[in-house]
Amino acid sequence: MENHQKTSFTFEIENFSERKYLIWSPIFISGQCHWFVKVYPIKDNNYDHVSVYLHVANPQSLRPGWKRRAHFSLILSNQSGKEVKIPSDSCDLFCTELSSSYPKILPPIKLKEEGFLENDKLIITVEVKVVEVVHPGELTGKEMVEFKELQDLYNGVQQNKEVVKNCELMNMDMKQDSLKSNHHEVSLKDKKRDDADESRFQKLEERLKNLELMELDCLKSKLEEVSIKNKKADADRSRVQRLEERLKNLELMDLDCLKSKLELVSIKNKKADADRSRIQRLEERVKKLELMELDDLKSKLEEVSLERKKSDDAYRSRVYQLEECFKNLELMVLDFKVELDKKKDKSCDDGFLLVDEFA
């Protein structure tokens, strides 16, 4: 005996009221065993219920003699968080002959009334606790007795099935005898109808043959057209293949050409980068020279401006002196003129006096 931890698995069924057939859940693992759940909604006039079964997954892949015991309980819930648990009072046995549990019965009316079909969705949580797992070669004496009793029960069920099958076969034989007698009577009546219908059938067969011949001719012509179209399509496909090959060759040639051009461009770019670096260096040198020349020119200009200022000052002073001399000369000339005029006036007066004396 070994107890495993309880495992829960939840799955949702959408549009539950519209489901009419068996619903399988995904496979899940509990107690190192693979399981799945079957939900079977049965709806008829006499009985309406939902059966939920726990199944062992892929029992045919297990070795003979396997056996498992597990507790199986259900929890129903809705989207609003309401829950109800359907516990398990017994421990179910799973083996080769019984790979599923006893069903849990759920009435759909109660599911609707208690609000477990909210938005027509049924949410089922399966709780499985594996109590015992027996592999082949691990059976004890007590377990062998239980297994043999279970196998005898299974064999008895199989024998009862064979008895039921034999009874069904006897009933079928009796039904066949009655059917044969009825068939003989019906066959006499049908023979007359068959004789009358035979001529009609022959005529219909002839018309059908004519139609078939016409259809065959039509089909042959269509087949020839289709074959011609297929030949054209094959020719077009071959042309397309040749064009694709040529295109690939051209693309390869273009790639080679582009690669060579790219190499040339890269070389040119490298040269251009080298030239640009040289130009930058030259520009820097020219800037330095220009700055040096500007400084030299500024110093020379300052010297020239100082010399010119000195010469201008000397020139101005000389001009000022000349202007003063010129003014003095003008004053002297004016004084000289005044004295000359005075002398002229005086000489005139003296002349008049002489004239008066001589007169």
From Swiss-Prot:
Signal peptide: none annotated. CDD domains: MATH. Residues 146-337 form a coiled coil. Residues 6-128 form the MATH domain. Transmembrane segments: none annotated. Keywords: Coiled coil. This is MATH domain and coiled-coil domain-containing protein At2g42475. It comes from Arabidopsis thaliana (Mouse-ear cress).
